[in-house]
């Protein structure tokens, strides 16, 4: 019987979740969807001092925005403490763990001596019970840690889906602390129990976890489990070549939403940030799931390129439905001081978006460029003096008169402009610039006929005539 694929995303809610973090959700999500398996969300919140509910919310919000739906969870490690203690008790009863009374100061001194002797700093097994070995007397009033009896010989090995065969000698691994003096279990132990209980078949995570893997495999086998398939993803670097982090200026996942990026663009970009399908650059979420495999995960660090993401976002904006973009733009209008009432009274927002979206790389840019349709223009005196000259004023008056009666279409408006230019022997910029300035408040707009059509007859004629009084 074939085992159903079960993957997981297991973030620690200790702050900021950036693109490098969320990629470790995207790939296991895609693999689970491709294999018709199960995607599990687990919140590893055992670092009580640093874990916050705000960080959990940011994780859930970021995943929801990108459409990374999970089938089971979220499971919280702090809510599973009874289960961890149960397994610890089983391990104690089986002789798989032992109490260690070595103090932090003693351990630090031991490691310093080892470093001075040119040895690898590691716990030396002072309190590890062995046949015929006499252990020190436990110090009074000291609560011990619990250490896992790591095998002393042999190797722990796995075939990593990204890095290939990895073998670590057990002699290199000391006996890991799996429970603190107060009885709370440690990270590596909780991870193993969770992966075992949740029947995880594939662990796709960052390669900063490679060093944890041999320890986790040994604990897993001691508990009677078999290791999952591991795929350790190379680091995501920022544009300066440093590991992506908040400290080095990374933006949060929802920060991209708040900057006007579309989720489909971010998913497409993230998919290519460490995986490839031939030369394909642009593909839908459905294509990504269909194509995704572990064999084509990159083996080298991937470097973030903001310009590439902006280019992808511009592509998806061009493809997006105008009504959807109009809704997404509303919060950005609010930031510009333009409320829903102003939007309702002004030009049709979906039509405005349709005119402007080909020039924008973010939804925020669309709102900024569209603001002129929902504000009263306030051109400065210098611009008015430069463009609304005595030479052009008669042409403006004739144009306003013509626009009162023409059919209100782009073609009819263009014809009225052309006729006015011919009658007054003007070039297009001589007329279009002042018209733009008086109607929109700026000399920089898309094609003048399209802009005037969206402003509407009453607004266009009224603003031109007001300037001529």
Swiss-Prot record:
Subcellular location, principal: cytoplasm
Skewed-composition ranges (Basic and acidic residues): 114-131
One GO cellular component, as annotated: cytosol
Catalytic activity: tRNA(Glu) + L-glutamate + ATP = L-glutamyl-tRNA(Glu) + AMP + diphosphate
Motif 'HIGH' region location, chain numbering: 11-21
One GO term (biological process): glutamyl-tRNA aminoacylation
Domain of life, per lineage: Bacteria
General function of this protein: Catalyzes the attachment of glutamate to tRNA(Glu) in a two-step reaction: glutamate is first activated by ATP to form Glu-AMP and then transferred to the acceptor end of tRNA(Glu).
Protein name: Glutamate--tRNA ligase
Lineage: Bacteria, Pseudomonadati, Pseudomonadota, Betaproteobacteria, Burkholderiales
